[in-house]
Amino acid sequence: MKIIIDAMGGDFAPEAPVRGALLAREKYGADIILTGRTADILRELEKAGCKEVPQGIEIANAEEVVEICDDPATAFKQKKDSSLTVGLNLLRDGQADGFISAGSTGALLAGATLVVKRIRGLRRAALAPTIPTMTGKAVLIDCGANAECTSEYLLQFAYLGSYYAEKVLGIVQPRVGLLNIGAEPSKGDTLRRETYARLKEAGGQGHLNFIGNIEANTALAGGCDVIVADGYSGNIMLKSVEGAAKLMSGELKKMLTKSAKTKLAYLLLKDGLADFKKMLDPNEVGGTALLGISRPVVKAHGSSNAAAFCNAVRQTIAVAESGIIADITQNVDKMKITPEKD
């Protein structure tokens, strides 16, 4: 398995991507292509103790970088020698099995759509992070790729999320819920009501295990396995979950270290608290799958450290090996979406 990593994307590039590549090579045996400025990558490899480029690691030179402040709509086209563009071109040409970037989300979405292409028949690609719930995990789709959606897009997202939950996470007959302000079918705006009708019809035909509308608190309690949302609502939910996790971890630590008695309790609970913190840590997940693209693409968090990049490689391998893209391609007709003309 060969994975491409954008070595210039993210807050801690190129150090975090390069060191993450070395960890992934050691832990998963994956071959890695690092795209970016060769001199910068070699410098980081040297800092990591590598006197030469290790076996299983390749460098694809790219002199330009798509910055987070660049306009996503134009940056990808203007910077043709960027680490992002070079990596996506390699993926399109079949030089690797997947691509990871912690750079600009908008540029990655635009580049993946224009270069690697969506699966024929799909209207939009969507970001599908895995979030923790009280009973395990759930797929949240979309969480920022599409701020404005139609009911057709959300129907498509439900299928994509369901395939991901089943094929990658191993959930049998994943329960699909529509993120809304109430559980009743009449709740929500026009988009939510129209989407509810489409999802209910798909559920009646046995194509989806649709359980109805679901509120955010119920979803986090484990009420469903796939949370369907437009990118605007989904992103707010995701950021709220991340913020709440930081709040809980910080407050819990303060409570358990404010006196001698609580410090003793902290020592007794230390291992359990470490597991709790690990469950809430986005670096443990690795990244967010960009579903609907014809090859595996994963968006790593902008603040990803080396461990996060390593975990993103694990996740990308899981997507590549799952057969999810082939399954989606073969079942587009179920989604009631007429293929667009090339």
Residue spans for each PLM region:
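N-terminal phosphate-binding or glycine-rich loops at protein starts, especially the Walker A/P-loop
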Residues: 1-43
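Short, glycine-rich nucleotide/cofactor-binding loops
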Residues: 3-15, 145-155, 299-304
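Short beta-strand segments
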Residues: 6, 35-36, 58-60, 101-103, ...
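Short glycine/serine/threonine-rich phosphate/pyrophosphate-binding segments
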Residues: 12-17, 81-94, 98-112, 119, ...
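Glycine-rich phosphate/diphosphate-binding loop of Rossmann-like nucleotide-binding domains
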Residues: 15-16, 28-33, 38-39, 147-216, ...
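Phosphate/nucleotide-donor binding subsite
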Residues: 50-96
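Glycine-rich phosphate-binding loop
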Residues: 90-109, 187, 192-198, 202-275
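Glycine-rich phosphate/nucleotide-binding loop
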Residues: 113-127, 132-140, 223-227, 231-341
